[in-house]
A protein has these predicted regions:
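S-adenosyl-L-methionine-dependent DNA methyltransferase catalytic core
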Residues: 1-28, 140, 166-350
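Core alpha/beta nucleotide-donor-binding catalytic domains of modification enzymes
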Residues: 2-113, 119-134, 142
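Short catalytic/ligand-binding loop motif for oxyanion handling, primarily in non-cytosolic enzymes
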Residues: 18, 81-85, 122-125, 159-163, ...
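Short, surface-exposed amphipathic charged segments that create phosphate/polyanion-binding patches used
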Residues: 66-68, 163-170
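Alpha/beta-hydrolase-fold catalytic nucleophile elbow
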Residues: 77, 117, 154, 170
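A short helix->loop->beta-strand "cap" motif at the edges of active sites that frequently abuts
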Residues: 110-112, 146, 165
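Short beta-strands and strand-loop turn motifs
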Residues: 115-120, 151, 322
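Conserved S-adenosyl-L-methionine
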Residues: 146-157
Length: 350
């Protein structure tokens, strides 16, 4: 039996890329991750994978050099807050410089393939000198002998029920004529495939709210039961709003619209026929996406459940996560969708 090719995951988070690589037969023997809660989640799901270190900047060269000749693929979902349209765009943010550690590990280990993942915003983000960050990254890899290609994918093309655009970078020392899959054959998933009737965090609303939002009766989840727990404070606030204004103009009576946000101050009642909007790590703090439900007692709205968030990000429902609900949502919001990495890895190892 041929041994599985070994891989190293850098900036692993809770293990989205590790799961994706594992699904293609790669053996992710080593990983690095700074946050202890994320490490715990990774360890619970991949007990055979060894933590190289927490702060990648403190992993000595010698530790990486020991892996030379042993690693087929290095994956790095290096931090994206400096490049994200939703994050702070500070060119001096040290998190935006961590790609240097990806380059260092590659130089010392000399893998066959490298895969990087980041937000689409990296395409346009500039350095303090006015050049593109992406050009700087490509040049640093070119200097150590790796030719890189990049492409933007939407995770829904890989069968993830979420519109989540990510920049994927693939590099190797040998020429790659066709480095990226088309993903056109992946089965399509929408929210209807992952949403389940659940009264956790539900709050009762007037049918008039859903009517104004444009929610069709047939797209409301139906079941029985009483609300469980306390509704999210932000949901309570938005449900109580009346006569919503934006830019000094009244735009609606209620602060909700169906399938899209009517204005930046609106929340969205999700349309189960389509994919979710991008889920970010602040969803627990200020959720803007809600599920409509109905019982014999009336109509309700609730946030996504943690199991739904897992599936919306491409994780199985039984994926283990450490920490409280907020910490779990942060982990998932920061994760790379495993099916996207599975498809890319399967293609380059075909």
């Amino acid at each position: 039996m041929v041994a599985a090719a070994a891989a190293l995951s850098l900036f692993s988070g809770c293990g989205g890329d590790t799961l994706g690589m594992s699904q293609t037969g790669l053996d992710v023997k080593w990983y690095s991750e700074l946050v202890s809660t994320f490490q715990e989640s990774h360890d619970m799901n991949f007990k055979h994978s060894t933590l190289l270190g927490g702060d990648i900047r403190k992993i000595p060269d010698e530790k990486f050099e020991e892996l030379r000749g042993k690693v087929d693929t290095i994956f790095a979902g290096f931090p994206c807050q400096s490049f994200s349209h939703g994050g702070k765009k500070d060119p001096d943010d040290p998190r935006g410089q961590l790609f240097h550690q990806f380059v260092r590990a590659t130089r010392l280990i000399q893998p066959k393939f490298i895969i990087g993942e980041n937000v689409k915003g990296l395409l346009t983000r500039k350095t303090q000198n006015g050049g593109l960050f992406l050009d700087l990254i490509l040049e640093e890899f070119r200097t150590i002998g790796y030719t890189c290609h990049y492409k933007v994918f939407s995770a829904d093309a890989a069968g993830v029920p979420q519109s989540r655009e990510r920049l994927i970078l693939v590099g190797s020392k040998e020429p790659m004529a066709d480095p990226f899959p088309s993903l056109r054959g992946s089965p399509k998933k929408v929210l209807r495939d992952v949403l389940r009737f659940d009264m956790a965090g539900a709050i009762k609303v007037d049918r008039e709210l859903l009517t104004e939002a444009g929610v069709p009766e047939e797209h409301i989840l139906v079941g029985e039961g009483e609300p469980i727990g306390t509704p999210h404070p932000y949901l309570q606030l938005k449900v109580s709003e009346r006569d919503v204004t934006y830019n000094g103009k009244r735009v609606s009576t209620y602060a909700f619209s169906f399938g899209k946000r009517k204005s930046p101050v609106h929340c969205e009642v999700v349309d189960p026929r389509i994919c979710s909007k991008t889920l970010i790590c602040t969803y627990d703090h200020q959720p803007r996406l809600f599920v409509a439900q109905k019982t014999p007692e009336g109509y309700y709205l609730r946030p996504y459940t943690i199991d739904e968030i897992k599936e919306i990000q491409g994780f199985p429902r039984d994926y283990k996560l450490s920490g409280n609900l907020k910490q779990q949502i942060v982990q998932l919001g920061n994760a790379v969708p495993p099916p996207l990495i599975r498809e890319v890895c399967a293609w380059i190892h075909r």
